[in-house]
Amino acid sequence: MDLLGPIHDILLVSLGSGIILGSLGVVLLTNPIYSAFSSGLVLVRISLFHILSNSYFVAAAQLLIYVGAINVLIIFAVMFMNGSEYYNNFHLWTVGDGISSVVCTSILFSLIATILDTSWYGIIWTTRSNQIIEQDLTSNVQQIGIHLSTDFFLPFELISIILLVALVGAIAMARAE
């Protein structure tokens, strides 16, 4: 979207804070239904980020695939779980939680260090050269492929990591029963 600078910044800050709050809701809420709805909220807000960056196809694909299919599937799976069994086996803190929190915190700090050490000028220069290549492409599918592998590579990979974590969590929940 072509918005004015301050409006664009306000939307980015509100979407970012909503994603952070929704992510905290996914992790911290003890009711799995609330956690699944919070996950849907996060995925909708991520698709709004794609709309702000003028990638309407990726936003529509994310809404249809991740929110419309996968999140609804997660909600159905949670609704079919026996809630009383889940809460009887619920422990507030385990050794595995401590280990995974240490691992996740170290990954967070390594990502922060990587982001601070990255030369963003080279990345911007690379995407501008890809805009020249885009004019020669005839097919929309080729343009989508170029954009997914250059401009939207990071959001595409982050979404795939979120999906992988959801899949591992679903397998862990299925094994527990």
Swiss-Prot record:
InterPro entries: NAD(P)H-Q_Oxidoreduct_6 (IPR050290), NADH_UbQ/plastoQ_OxRdtase_su6 (IPR001457), Nuo/plastoQ_OxRdtase_6_NuoJ (IPR042106)
Record GO terms (molecular function): NADH dehydrogenase (ubiquinone) activity; quinone binding
Subcellular location: Plastid, Chloroplast thylakoid membrane
UniProt EC number: 7.1.1.-
Bilayer-crossing regions: 10-30, 32-52, 61-81, 93-115, 152-172
The organism's taxonomic lineage, starting at the top: Eukaryota, Viridiplantae, Streptophyta, Embryophyta, Tracheophyta
Descriptive protein name: NAD(P)H-quinone oxidoreductase subunit 6, chloroplastic
Lipid bilayer topology: Multi-pass membrane protein
Keyword Transmembrane tagged: yes
